[in-house]
Amino acid sequence: IDELTNLKNRTALEDDIKDDDFVSIALIDIDSFDDINELYGFSTGNLVLIEVGKILNEFSLKYDVSVYRIYGNVYCLADKKMMGFFKFNELIEELAVLFKNKPLYIEQLDIDIFVNITLGISIAQEESIKTAGIALKKAKKNNLPYFVYNNDIDTKEMIEKSMYWREKIKKALKNDKVIPFYQAIFDVDKNI
């Protein structure tokens, strides 16, 4: 059990789905949570985590799914009953709307903190936590409210390319093989 939110934790999720190869899950990430911590402090950030956990717990009862706090500001909804793609998609769309600029009243500060979420969805995939994580990363990268994992995402190849170019650039910088080119910027009067 997660001590802060009293929700099940990642270990419980892994135990709950270990025998179910094709469970559907949604990873839920609170957008710009670091900004909340920096602006209001960690204790207020914790209050936001607790409130989001309460909302997700109530939401999970409506759809008969399980809710978990995985780590930090990431939660998970898991459907082990195989409600199907369309029903799970309906759940996701409703959740995305529910958290669109969701005001959370923080009584201790007498303020509303507005929260948005991004979701990564894995529907009936093997390694559902991993594939939902890939989908979450893709949603965040493309500034989407949610993304549903599909097998067309070839992340291994993408990661290999990224690693290749990262090493190539590091080596070029280290060996002083980078030649910078500059172009002067002029205003309309041709002043630099």
What are these regions (language model features)?
Residues A12, D16, E160-I192:
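Active-site core of bacterial EAL-family cyclic-dinucleotide phosphodiesterase domains
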Residues I1, T5-S24, D31-E58, Y68-L77, ...:
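Conserved long alpha-helical elements within nucleotide-processing catalytic cores of c-di-GMP signaling
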Residues K18-S24, K62-D64, S122-E127:
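Short glycine/proline-enriched coil/turn segments at helix->beta-strand junctions
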